[in-house]
């Protein structure tokens, strides 16, 4: 049954309790897409242990702030009746409850595309209500993951775990389509508690291949992610040093490119040393690069440790997914880079 979270203090120390090492699957419904000015209307979460056995559920309804006008597109999507906008907790009370949930020691917060949308929305909500916006990412052994990039990897390399829906002849990885195709939905899509329940069921499907699940968890740990990237083979040597090569996996690249592109490391960001920079190598226009046209002919990707995209080693079983045409472009670009140092 649903329950509103009972407020309790969160220790600054490393102490763990019965909730330690748990997943907190969550979803939000909002008034729009603007993280600075829109607000959360619904928050729902299901906490599980590390074997995905449910521990408890939480639901929070948030009253509309007087300075917020909901986006018509958001209202059509989440289908929350306008008459309900005046119900629920004020934003501060709701943010405080959610903050305590996500900061429970040992909590791994995750959802479907949460690192692409929900997590940043949560940070803005916490900051606006004078709550620390980042502690759920690192403090008290807390961390975060995202099921969307995990779904992409399973689609590429463990396809048998799901039925993969096609809409108008194209693969769709939208949660509602995955839920319908695999009979995971019980209720109205885009209602927070329904979506988070689907997310948990989806995770349980993936967890049947537990070795894969545990391996992918490592890509959301900064140290593990950094170690794996340090093990990538050298693809190019230059006066600047060795440049590792790999395959960057992200939803940004879409099903037409199997969600992955060949890349080579080109160093770290100067203003943000914790970010690595990667050059995409499957675009033919790269060989047209001049000092004046760099912005038009190159695609540089910023990669934060422990966050998507996922960089896979260039093993044959992964590399074959880019196809012969893109592999040929990659080889030509690599030779061009070597010749034009």
Question: Which residue ranges define each predicted feature?
Answer:
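Metal-dependent phosphoesterase signature
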Residues: 77-94
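C-terminal structural cap/anchor segments
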Residues: 338-341
């Amino acid at each position: 049954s649903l329950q509103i979270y009972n407020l309790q203090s969160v220790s600054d120390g490393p102490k763990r309790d019965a909730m330690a090492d748990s997943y907190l699957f969550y979803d939000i419904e909002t008034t729009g897409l603007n993280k600075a000015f829109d607000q959360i209307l619904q928050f729902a979460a299901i906490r599980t242990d590390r074997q995905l056995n449910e521990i408890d559920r939480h639901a929070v309804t948030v009253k509309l702030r007087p300075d917020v006008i909901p986006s018509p597109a958001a209202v059509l999507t989440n289908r929350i009746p306008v008459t309900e906008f005046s119900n629920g907790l004020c934003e501060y009370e709701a943010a405080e409850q959610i903050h305590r949930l996500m900061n429970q020691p040992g909590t791994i917060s995750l959802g479907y595309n949460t690192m692409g949308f929900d997590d940043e929305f949560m940070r803005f909500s916490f900051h606006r209500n004078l709550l620390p916006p980042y502690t759920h990412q690192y403090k008290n052994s807390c961390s975060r993951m995202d099921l969307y990039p995990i779904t992409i990897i399973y689609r590429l390399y463990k396809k048998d775990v799901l039925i993969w829906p096609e809409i108008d002849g194209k693969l769709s990885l939208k949660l509602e389509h995955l839920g319908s195709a695999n009979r995971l939905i019980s209720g109205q899509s885009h209602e927070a508690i329904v979506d988070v329940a689907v997310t948990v069921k989806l995770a349980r499907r993936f967890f049947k291949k537990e070795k894969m699940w545990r391996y992918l968890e490592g890509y959301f740990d900064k140290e593990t992610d950094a170690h794996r990237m340090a093990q990538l083979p050298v693809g190019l040597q230059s006066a600047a040093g060795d440049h590792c090569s790999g395959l960057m996996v992200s939803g940004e690249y879409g099903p037409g490119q199997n969600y992955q592109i060949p890349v080579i490391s080109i160093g770290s960001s100067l203003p943000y040393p914790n970010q690595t920079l990667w050059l995409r190598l499957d675009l033919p226009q790269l060989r047209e690069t001049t000092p004046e046209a760099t912005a038009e002919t190159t695609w540089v990707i910023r990669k934060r440790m422990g966050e998507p995209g996922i960089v896979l080693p260039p093993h044959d079983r992964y590399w074959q997914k880019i196809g012969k045409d893109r592999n040929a472009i990659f080889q030509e670009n690599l030779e061009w880079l070597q010749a034009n140092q």
